[in-house]
Amino acid sequence: MANQNINNDVAKKEKTYWEQAIYDARKYGVNLNGMVVCLDNGHGKATKGKGSPWSLHKVEPAIPLREYEFTRKVTAKLKELLEAMGAYVYMVCPEVEGDTSLSARAARANNLKNTYKKTGKKAYFVFVSVHADAIGDGTKWMPGSNGWAVWTTKGQNVSDTFADCVWEAANETFTPMGMRMRQQKANDGDPDYEADFTVIKKANMPAILTENFFYTDPTDCEFINTERGVEAIAVAHAKGIGKFAQRRYGFKTRDSYTRPVDPGLLLEKENS
């Protein structure tokens, strides 16, 4: 029996970071059954200038990164985590080619919410637009301009609470990893930056836009170019969404896996 216990302990220690994250989400995470998360992976392949100095101009150090590829890696991992927690996840922009407009992205999420509302069933909708940040014209690395940040629209509303929760989870995740957290000067009491970005301004639900480090800073870019970096970003978002569901809507943690709610809706593909 003693040997069996030792073997079990060894097996637990051998879980990868991601395997442990999925296990924790299913075993200890907030039960998000009844939550619909609209995930927007920022930008498309055709969006110009969205890449590291190496990817755009072969400026060393040789750290390749394209924002559209990075955001799709993050949202794919985040979808997996959120579904493990019981949420229904709607991928706002599954297409890669082209550059789907910001208004179209918000409209897709709004259409899903409006269509579901007509069924008379209850669900809580949130919108998350995932990006990476940059500074300069992309022709050189800009060390020192770095860190993680979250944005909401101007003024105080429920999205500020959402942003607070995700910022807290990101801080808990990234600070121990030695990564910088950014926040606005505390003139309105919360850490999020504010701007009326179209994609979150037009989303008719609590909506945030996250800037997941700078691909123009070598240290940040190297971090988000790794599997561990992508996974940590997904974990931070999932924990933050769970915090918001608890704080705002009274969702509870759970002891066992719950299958995700499926609104049972198929939206026709929209023209971008």
Regions found by a protein language model. Name each.
Residues 6-108, 136, 144-146, 266-270:
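Active-site histidine-acidic residue metal-binding/catalytic motifs
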Residues 26, 102-123, 159, 197-203:
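Mature extracellular/periplasmic domains of secretome proteins
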Residues 33-35, 82-90, 119-127, 173-177, ...:
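Loop/turn elements at helix/coil->beta-strand transitions in domains of secreted/extracellular proteins
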Residues 35-40, 116, 136, 182-272:
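Active-site-adjacent mobile loop/cap segments within catalytic or ligand-binding domains
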Residues 43-46, 89, 95-99, 132-138, ...:
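Solvent-exposed loop/turn segments at secondary-structure junctions
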Residues 65-73, 99-103, 156-161, 224-235:
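Soluble non-cytosolic domains of exported or imported proteins
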Residues 72-79, 103-106, 147, 160-167, ...:
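Extracytoplasmic/secreted envelope proteins and their assembly/folding machinery
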Residues 159-190:
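Active-site-adjacent substrate-binding region
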